[in-house]
Regions:
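Short, functionally important secondary-structure microenvironments
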Residues: 1-81, 87-189
Length: 189
C-alpha cells in the first residue's frame, strides 16, 4: 500500500500576513467568499501552514499545508480552484473515509470525484483555463484548475461516490501524482 510522506508540523510555519504567498492566498480567499460563502467560512476556520515538505498543497482532516513555490506558480484563478478542491477533501471527510485504503489510489478517486463536482458547480475543467463567474451586483470572479489534475467526465456526482470510484478497476494509480495532493500528514489517509 502506498504511503504519503510525513509532514513535521513543528517545522511548518504559520502564515505571515506580509508575505507574497499569503497575500496571494488571501486574494483567492476573497474570490472564494464571492463564489461560495460556505467555503470561505471553512477556509477562515482551518489552520494553514507553509512548508517545503509537500510538493503542492496537502490537507489533513483539520489542517492545510502549502508549498510557497507551488502557489507562486499558479494563476489566481487556479489557486482559487485548488483551494476549493482541497476544502472539498476536508469537508467531505476524505481523510477519515480513506482509513485502511491505499492512500494514493484513494486520493485519486477523491480527486476525480471532486473535479467532477467542481465541473458541475463552477464549470471548471483541469487545464482548460479559467471560468468567469458573475452574479448580480457582484465583481466578476475567475476560477480554474491547473493542468494535470485528475478529471473524468464520465463520473456522475449523483450516482458515484469516492468509495465506488476507488473500487473501479479502470482507476489506476497515476504515473506521477498531481502536486496539490491531499492526505494525512502522518502518512495514512
Amino acid at each position: 500500500m502506498g504511503r504519503r510522506p510525513f509532514v513535521d508540523v513543528t517545522t511548518a510555519e504559520k502564515p505571515d500576513p506580509q508575505s507574497a504567498e499569503e497575500k496571494q492566498f488571501s486574494l483567492s480567499a476573497l474570490d472564494i467568499k464571492r463564489l461560495c460563502p460556505f467555503f470561505y467560512a471553512a477556509i477562515c476556520m482551518i489552520p494553514r501552514f507553509y512548508t517545503d515538505q509537500v510538493p503542492g498543497i496537502r490537507v489533513t482532516a483539520d489542517k492545510i499545508f502549502i508549498n510557497r513555490r507551488y502557489i507562486g506558480s499558479l494563476s489566481r484563478a487556479e489557486l482559487t480552484g485548488v483551494i476549493i478542491h482541497e476544502l472539498y477533501h476536508i469537508l467531505m471527510s476524505h481523510n477519515v473515509r480513506g482509513a485502511g485504503k491505499d492512500p494514493v489510489r484513494w486520493n485519486r478517486a477523491c480527486d476525480l470525484y471532486i473535479s467532477k463536482c467542481m465541473n458541475e458547480t463552477f464549470g471548471t475543467v483541469p487545464g482548460k483555463g479559467s471560468v468567469s463567474l458573475s452574479m448580480p451586483d457582484m465583481v466578476k470572479t475567475y476560477i480554474g484548475l491547473p493542468e494535470g489534475m485528475p478529471f473524468d467526465a464520465g463520473i456522475s456526482v449523483e450516482k458515484d461516490i469516492p468509495e465506488k470510484i476507488y473500487l473501479r478497476h479502470e482507476i489506476e494509480e497515476p504515473e506521477h501524482e498531481f502536486n496539490a495532493s491531499s492526505g494525512d500528514a502522518g502518512g495514512a489517509s
